[in-house]
């Protein structure tokens, strides 16, 4: 089965009117829309697979990488020999970097190829990876609001929707405290600050965070590859640490884990190489007795990749990150079966669900 075509499809889906957010790693304050990049791979036998690259400000760069660097290396190759092909692509392109938009683009093509292989086998991807759970726990991952009243409202809405674990992206203590006050003692809170602090600053802030009772503090240090600093903060603060979203290679995940830097490891399938690389992290983490909590702050094939891999390879404490955005539309419409803090693993062939063609037509941009 030969790869006949690769198409990168950028989407821009607006937030619903009245939605407010603060500036963050993904965009400016009151971001009007969220950008995604889907990748469609077609074979000579007519099978189609879908992948996703991490989006936001990187969409244009990732699309360029797909169109000009990756597609020419993949078209005409065997779609079923995924890992050999992706290794060849990485070796050919490594001089342009091992992370960033190029890695996002490689991730999208890899996910699409796994979708094709599952469809060819007429089996859900989780079965190809070893079987597993029919349902998974999920947590609501909120945007950054900064204003305590907005944080309270978002926390309240997520709890009313049935979530028992929430992720904040706040960096100011009043907003973080407001979230805990609104949530009460029985809701789990995690805090992702997106790498803002030195080790000294993080130690000072960690003292203030001890009363918040966080399930984990995520990516507190700049630079994100300061694994020794994370290990020191983990030891001195007593707060569980999570990281891995911005780790791109298997070697660096081993360094992260060997440093004793984390209580939870967070590979991101739409950033670090797709399913081929993601599935290697679970046994690596098991050696270190560390749960895998995939980063999946997206709602397309990258999310489904995280769901299938976690269903097959995760542990009882693994959870799915569910982006809690108020958008005009979603890539899969209402097809994903969710209820409160649970999500059903799609059981169709491959990733189990294809993107809604009406959404693609309505929100595609150039």
Language-model features, listed with the residues they occupy:
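Non-catalytic terminal accessory/regulatory regions of metabolic enzymes
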Residues: 1-48, 67, 156, 165
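A cross-domain feature marking catalytic cores of carbohydrate-active enzymes
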Residues: 53, 99, 140-143, 168-170, ...
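Metal- or metallocofactor-binding catalytic centers and their adjacent structured scaffolds
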Residues: 42-120
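Shared catalytic-loop signature of beta/alpha-barrel
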Residues: 68, 207, 213, 221-243, ...
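Flexible C-terminal active-site loop/helix
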Residues: 2-18, 30-34, 109, 297-366
């Amino acid at each position: 089965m030969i790869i006949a075509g690769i198409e990168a499809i950028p989407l821009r889906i607006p937030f619903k009117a009245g939605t407010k957010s603060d500036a963050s790693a993904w965009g400016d304050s009151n971001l009007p829309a969220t950008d995604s990049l889907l990748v469609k791979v077609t074979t000579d036998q007519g099978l189609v697979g879908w992948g996703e690259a991490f989006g936001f400000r990187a969409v244009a760069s990732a699309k360029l990488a797909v169109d000009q660097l990756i597609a020419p290396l993949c078209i005409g190759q065997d779609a079923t020999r995924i890992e050999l092909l992706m290794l060849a692509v990485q070796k050919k392109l490594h001089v342009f970097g091992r992370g960033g938009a190029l890695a996002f683009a490689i991730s999208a093509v890899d996910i699409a190829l796994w979708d094709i292989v599952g469809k060819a086998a007429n089996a859900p991807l989780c079965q190809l990876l070893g079987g597993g759970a029919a349902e998974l726990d999920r947590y609501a991952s909120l945007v950054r609001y900064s204003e305590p009243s907005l944080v309270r409202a978002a926390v309240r809405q997520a709890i009313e929707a049935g979530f028992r674990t929430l992720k904040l992206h706040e960096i100011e203590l009043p907003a973080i405290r407001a979230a805990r006050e609104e949530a009460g003692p029985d809701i789990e809170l995690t805090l992702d600050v997106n790498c803002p602090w030195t080790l000294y600053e993080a130690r000072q802030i960690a003292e203030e965070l001890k009363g918040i009772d966080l399930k984990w503090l995520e990516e507190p240090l700049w630079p994100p590859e300061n694994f020794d600093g994370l290990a020191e903060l983990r030891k001195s603060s007593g707060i569980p640490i999570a990281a891995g979203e911005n780790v791109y290679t298997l070697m660096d995940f081993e360094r992260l884990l060997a440093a004793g830097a984390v209580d939870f490891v967070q590979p991101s399938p739409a950033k670090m190489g797709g399913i081929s690389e993601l599935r290697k992290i679970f046994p690596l983490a098991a050696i270190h007795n560390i749960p895998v909590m995939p980063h999946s702050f997206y709602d397309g094939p990258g999310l489904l990749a995280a769901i299938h891999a976690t269903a097959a390879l995760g542990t009882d404490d693994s959870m799915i990150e569910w982006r809690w955005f108020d958008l005009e539309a979603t890539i899969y419409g209402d097809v994903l079966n969710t209820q409160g803090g649970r999500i059903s693993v799609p059981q169709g062939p491959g990733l189990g669900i294809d993107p809604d063609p009406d959404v693609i037509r309505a929100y595609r941009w150039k």
